[in-house]
Design a protein with these regions (language model features):
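Cys/His-rich Zn2+-binding cysteine-cluster or related metal-binding knuckle/ribbon modules and their
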Residues: 124
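Short secondary-structure boundary segments
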Residues: 97, 120, 142
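Acidic/glycine-rich phosphate/pyrophosphate-binding loops and surrounding catalytic core
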Residues: 1-88, 92, 101-109, 113-118, ...
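Active-site loop ensemble at the mouth of alpha/beta enzyme cores that anchors a bound cofactor
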Residues: 153-156
Length: 156
């Protein structure tokens, strides 16, 4: 969280250990992170597998038409997908597995109109450079799906 700086939020994802979601999300908050999605019912999350079955602009337009008060996040993995959805009324662009140069370019294009989020293969070595692109938040799945154990012992 400290590596990302004060302007960029670190978020966990929906990927949690079965039956431990509430506890893991609480632990993220205690550690200074943010919970922005508890599950898929919180918002429309349009991912690459949805887009593969349709034109990205058409799919996002359909979600906008049926959103019923929920926010919409659209995952893009290249700048062409981003350009295709610009101008549509949704909430967040999720840049997935993009290299730093493309991420920086994407944030520059989208930042005025949408919240921005980066995700995919982000770790302690890369989080600072990802935050420096200007994204609003970074979601890191390994916070909840692959937590490391602490060495805790009690000696008497």
């Amino acid at each position: 969280v400290k590596l990302a700086g004060k302007k960029c939020k670190i978020c966990c994802t929906r990927k949690t250990i079965p039956n431990l979601r509430v506890i893991q999300k609480y632990a993220v908050k205690l550690g200074g992170g943010t919970n922005h999605r508890f599950n898929l019912s919180d918002e429309f999350l349009i991912k690459d597998n949805h887009i593969a079955s349709s034109n990205i602009r058409d799919f996002v337009s359909l979600a906008i038409k049926n959103k019923k008060g929920r926010k919409i996040t659209v995952e893009v993995d290249n700048l062409n997908q981003l350009r295709a959805i610009m101008g549509l009324k949704f909430n967040t662009v999720l840049f997935d597995n993009m290299n730093i140069n493309n991420l920086k370019a994407g944030v520059k294009i989208a930042k005025k109109y949408y919240e921005t989020e980066a995700s995919g293969n982000i770790n302690l070595k890369t989080v600072k450079s990802v935050a420096a692109t200007g994204v609003d938040r970074i979601s890191i799945g390994r916070i909840t799906h692959s937590p490391s154990a602490i060495d805790l012992k009690l000696e008497i």
